[in-house]
Amino acid sequence: MFKKFKPVTPGTRQLVLPAFDELTRQGDLTGKRTRKSVRPNKKLSFFKKSSGGRDNLGHISCRHRGGGAKRLYRVIDFKRNKDGIEAKVVSVEYDPNRSAYIALLNYADGEKRYILAPKGIKRGDQVISGEGSPFKLGCCMTLKSMPLGSTVHNIEMRPHSGGKLVRSAGLAAQVIAKTPGYVTLKMPSGEFRMLNEGCRATIGEVSNADHNLCVDGKAGRKRWKGVRPTVRGTAMNPVDHPHGGGEGRHNGYIPRTPWGKVTKGLKTRDKRKSNKWIVKDRRK
């Protein structure tokens, strides 16, 4: 769910924000009447200094980054390798470091871990990992154990490497076919891809599916998130961009990146990279 605002100021005229109805509040845990959000688990979070888009030499490696509010990084369990032990969902929380929500699990042996929250999971639900796990929302198992047509997320590229694929808000892949040793998945991009049957995935769709409907409404909200302005190349000087300079407006060139490479239509995939695991390309 999301909420719109009355246009009482220019910044709220286009503003669309998530309603955060799925999140657990402090009042849910304490019984008091409060809408304050749950604080992150201290042992599973730490302060991570912002790079400001710079590499280890201080050079800009990613443009348009810098500033923004400080963030606590939450340690997420992408491997889901604690097998055979049931866990209870303590809370569903906001994470400023990703578009999806996260869920805090309390295992039967007392250990706590954060995972990506599947869509529809709520406080008090039970989840479990490993072979023989029930086919239930939030449970994790290998791809070979899942029936055809299953909706999955947080998928490993190689066994025991931890989830790498389908982790953003609202995404899900589908199990399409099984062959000896491999499972074919339909990815959110439309690509059909083969993966080792020993790779793990979590059942369900990633939470916060309305994330793509949100509108920041003003430049200042982008700055709070650590996003700096984007300047057009034609507004720069020739020393700064291939499009820079010229008396007045000039557009008699092929569009290029700030580093001089053709920016439209140029293939960037390494020709030596194998395509044998891609059954159907997303572009076809």
From Swiss-Prot:
- Positions of disulphide bridges: none
Q: One biological process GO term for this chain?
A: cytoplasmic translation
GO-annotated molecular function:
rRNA binding; structural constituent of ribosome; transferase activity
> PROSITE patterns attached here?
RIBOSOMAL_L2
Q: Which SUPFAM superfamilies match?
A: Nucleic acid-binding proteins, Translation proteins SH3-like domain
Q: Which UniProt keywords apply?
A: Ribonucleoprotein, Ribosomal protein, RNA-binding, rRNA-binding
The organism's place on the tree of life at top rank: Bacteria
Question: What residue spans carry the Basic and acidic residues bias annotation?
Answer: 240-250
Return the InterPro entries for the record: NA-bd_OB-fold, Rib_uL2_dom2, Ribosomal_uL2, Ribosomal_uL2_bac/org-type, Ribosomal_uL2_C, Ribosomal_uL2_CS, Ribosomal_uL2_dom3, Ribosomal_uL2_RNA-bd_dom
Q: Which GO terms describe its cellular component?
A: large ribosomal subunit
> Positions of the region Disordered?
232-284
Name the family.
Belongs to the universal ribosomal protein uL2 family.
Protein name per Swiss-Prot or TrEMBL: Large ribosomal subunit protein uL2
User: Which species does this protein come from?
Assistant: Chlamydia felis (strain Fe/C-56)
